[in-house]
């Protein structure tokens, strides 16, 4: 798990019930949950109960407790009502029961099902985690001008404050190029790049902004965007493209040197594993043709072949067996 830039800063963060904590404290409880450190989680709860349901990028502590198989911590969080049964992991939109089932955590899956059936236990719901960046009026004006394509205003501000272009915390920590990239506004991107703006290497929403349009993605790759951009869960853009079956964009990433076999934390899978899990037959064939490792994974249950079998993708299973090495 990579600590995002905004969680390295001690910024005010709004939790459930309008309680305000800090990004540092939210990061600490998420890390403790990933480690299965029940006592650390309890200490956070003693300080602020809402931290038990604190979210960064829609992700609360129980997400990590379930994913990493920490039964006692999951049980504690459920006893505290710190789970919304409607929760779906971001961006893959799967339930925690699915995450537990994939890993063979049947006891945890059972706990989640029992909790979901008893609404009286559920104390929290929905999203939280709004971060307050404490920007000056001029910084807000700059961000707004970039968002609304106010080229002349942006240029004028950058002439006086060139350092604004290099601040990666703009637009919720996604970088100042975010909306120019989404709209394929190459004139604005060129201006920002000329003052030192870069696409951050750790992003939450890269596939929905920087790689939404092929033309914009190709432009940024040519300008030096890191082909191994990833989320804080080590999900790279190539993982995202593989999961969605976006072969043209996957080809673009590989052209600029993207690692073809990285393993993410969320599914313990390579891009090939993602493609196999989600039934992307064409992508499976493409990645294999480019030399993807057909065996590599982070766990025995997450190999490409294991995913194809578990999810019932018979054609992909045949392809993998044919190329097994």
Predicted features by range, described:
Residues 63-91, 261-310:
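Ankyrin-repeat and related helical/solenoid repeat scaffolds used for protein-protein interactions
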Residues 23-29, 54-61, 87-95, 135-142, ...:
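Ankyrin-repeat boundary/"N-cap" motif
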Residues 2-47, 67, 79, 110-161, ...:
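Intrinsically disordered, low-complexity regulatory segments in ankyrin-centric signaling systems
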